[in-house]
């Protein structure tokens, strides 16, 4: 399979553009020493599924980064499979009807913050699925899967620290193309 490659000034055809599967929908810069960042206008009916990333910037303390859809503060369920680099024992943790998706990212004190999570159907009036959140808190690493069991369509989300603050970095929201049309 060949992948599209574009040059400055080139006329792009529908065939060229239809080959692109992931579209950058929104970017937002994180401020200085903030405990949360709300990203508005991130989800729409144009895309069913999304990838959310946060790269760069730093966290002030070991801890996770959490995600909330719109203003919904209930109905979040999930399971975290994780481990500590000093132990070979796998660990698990659950969330049952909590106020947010925990563990979608994180970092170690003074180091880079990160989020990388897939969100399925946030703009549909149905349950929203969350897959492959990349958790870190100090030397603990893991992956979360979850579901938001509130049948509401959302356009916005908030990323928040579990402890400490975020400084700098960029949140990017990508929409997965719905088909070849």
Show the residue positions of the predicted features:
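Surface-exposed molecular-recognition determinants
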Residues: 2-181
């Amino acid at each position: 399979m060949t992948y599209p490659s574009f040059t400055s000034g080139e006329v792009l055809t529908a065939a060229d553009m239809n080959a692109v599967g992931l579209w950058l929908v929104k970017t937002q810069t994180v401020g200085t020493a903030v405990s949360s960042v709300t990203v508005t206008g991130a989800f729409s009916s144009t895309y069913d599924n999304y990838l959310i990333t946060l790269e760069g910037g730093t966290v002030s303390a070991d801890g996770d980064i959490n995600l909330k859809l719109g203003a919904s503060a209930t109905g979040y369920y999930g399971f975290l499979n994780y481990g500590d680099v000093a132990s070979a024992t796998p660990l698990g943790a659950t969330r049952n009807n909590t106020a947010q998706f925990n563990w979608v990212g994180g970092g170690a004190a003074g180091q880079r913050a990160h989020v990388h999570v897939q969100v399925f159907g946030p703009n549909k009036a149905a349950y929203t699925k969350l897959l492959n959140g990349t958790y870190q808190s100090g030397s603990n690493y893991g992956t979360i899967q979850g579901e938001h069991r509130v049948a509401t369509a959302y356009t916005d989300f908030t990323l928040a620290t579990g402890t400490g603050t975020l400084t700098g970095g960029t949140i990017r929201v990508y929409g997965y193309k719905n088909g070849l049309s």
